[in-house]
Amino acid sequence: MAVRKIERGHYFEDFEVGHLFKHHWGRTITEGDNSFFSSVTMNFNPSYFNREYAQSLGYKNVVVNHMLVMNVVFGLSVEDLSERAIAHLGYEKMKWHETVYPGDTITSESLVLSKRDTSRPDRGVVKFRTTGYNQRSEKVLEYERPVLIRKRNPSS
């Protein structure tokens, strides 16, 4: 059976500085998600899986692994920002704000900060600021990332 290729994502030319993408979906993070992610990444911080330990540190429950939060916020942005990416060029100015607990629902949005051509005519770099929120609209994470993205028309 042949695989049908579906064209998705934005080209470099499609991004406008100042445009705000409000990424659809959202993801409720469960205690199972948190335990699995922490185990598979070998991040055995007891505050991620031991309620009494987390409470002894002042948290109301186990906390969600910070890197799981980052990956969910990032994942929510992929469809809008980087389906046509050639490469992610890094993550900058990453800052966690509110603690995320199992049961919290994460949403995200991304602002186009800048775009520039590169020395190769078939690609350009777009820089985004992505912000993640919980279900109470509290900021949980914010970071910037430059992405190398294909051009629709390499001569433009």
List each language-model region with its residue ranges.
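HotDog/MaoC-like acyl-thioester-processing domains
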Residues: M1-E16, V100-S156
